[in-house]
Amino acid sequence: MKAFIAAAAMSLMLGAPVQAEEKRGEKMVPLSPTVLSAEDVQSVAPALVRFGSEVLIDDLWQRSELLRRDRSIVTVAILIARNQPAELKQYVDVALDNAVTPVEISEIITHLAFYSGWPNAMAAVAVTKDIFAARGIRREQLASASPELLALNQAAENQRSSTVEHNFGAISPGLVKFTAQPLFLDLWQRPGLKPRDRSLVTVSALIAAGQSAQIGYHLNRAMDNGLTAQEAGEIVAHAAFYAGWPNAFSAVAVVGEVLRARGLEG
């Protein structure tokens, strides 16, 4: 039932993706849903049709606190993290219509192989390859497997690596090794996602997985790279619908701690 509700709400929502050039606050252009029709949902849960229209379409996705491009990134990340490939198909299409590039979609999947697991990433690949094929997106349009990496913030990396080594080096040397290379010295330095967006993906996936203990570090990193306090709060509001209210409330407590520490709350 839980999976059905998620799919139903998603299909209603996806009756209204938008074009990239639309301004925030404009009503979405309706499209026919491709997973569940409104009639299918009416036959089982009529209230979901109302909530899907009044709340998801006409309210949540219209809110100006977060760009639709960013909402699309958050949603795609959550669906990959929760391994929901049926819903992901529609939201990858919506993301591409909302100015998320094929390179960015590719990098989101690659990034989440590390944060949500290889099987989840492979499930996302299986869905996305058909979308790319239908849109004529070719391999040569995607980022290189081994691109020139972004410049490393050596001071921040030194602090991260020393903390990890001190806390976990004697327990799991392998984890410490792989956290440095490839995670932070390769994956995080890939240019296919801007640092702010890579952190946005990570925070969204952590919320979806209920991993609130890890959110603070990555939210601080996102805000160091340009994410605003308003956007941070809105990510949690958006995630409530796609990852569930309990996960959102677990996350909002951590977000509040980060904002207070930065003098940004209120």
Regions found by a protein language model. Name each.
Residues 67, 101-106, 194, 228-230:
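Helix N-cap / loop-to-helix initiation motif
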Residues 7-15:
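Bacterial N-terminal signal peptides
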Residues 120-121, 211, 231-250:
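Preference for long, well-ordered alpha-helical segments
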Residues 16-20:
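Sec/Tat signal peptide C-region and signal peptidase I cleavage site
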Residues 80, 98, 111-118, 207, ...:
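A short structural micro-motif
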Residues 21-69, 82, 86-93, 97, ...:
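Acidic, glycine/proline-rich low-complexity segments that act as flexible tails and inter-domain linkers
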Residues 71-79, 108-109, 198-206, 235-239:
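Short, structured motif recognition centered on aromatic/hydrophobic residues
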Residues 1-7:
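Sec-dependent signal peptide recognition
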